[in-house]
Amino acid sequence: AVGPFAIEKGMIDAKEIKTNIVIRSVNTGSIIEATIQTPNKKVKYSGDYKIAGVPGEGSPILLKFKNLVGGVTGKLLPTDHPTTIINGIEVTCLDVSMPMVMANAKDFGIVGNETSNDLNENKTLLKKIEEIRLSAALKMGMGDVSGKVIPKFALLSKPLNGGTITSRYFTPKTCHETHAATGSNCIASACLISSTVASKITNIEATGNDKITIEHPLGLIDCLVETSTTVNSFDKNFIKS
């Protein structure tokens, strides 16, 4: 919405065919390059592109995320390890686009493909997630986050519909009906980092340009991740977009 709004309000001059707009996220410090379809220098809203969980169709907006690593904590792996044991549960704490805590759904006694409504009704589950999130935040150097919405939390499991991995994304005290793009970036990156909770589920290796498809309650979300060859040594700049 930011890109089309900026053009419509005259903040940005539209180009012929398409317009690239650079956006800075004040929440994480990351840079997002949005490509807006602008035939005849006008924003095009109509189209046949669909986003799972979003009603209707429209013109696609391509988002390229940059400077994603360590925006909040200053580290790719805020605990300095691909996994950490918190309250007896193995978790991965990662700061890519959004600081997150990830765990295997089976360690919480669920399959991982439950609906968001079912998970939101499971008060015991939500309480356990919040307890681990608060403890993880301390280990991530984020302090007391009891009144904050980050880090986010995700429960991961094997894909069931042709994707790479299944995620249930918590924002943080309720399960998202679909999935946040920032959280998708973080989970997709975790799939490509050796020994994380995510990579133990997917068992894939980074090739440099990887498509990660995340299954969420209402469909799929695709992430294209460009990495350097230093991905397994946790180089701070390994994620380029």
What role is predicted for each listed range?
Residues 1-241:
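Active-site proximal loop and beta-alpha junction motif in alpha/beta enzyme cores
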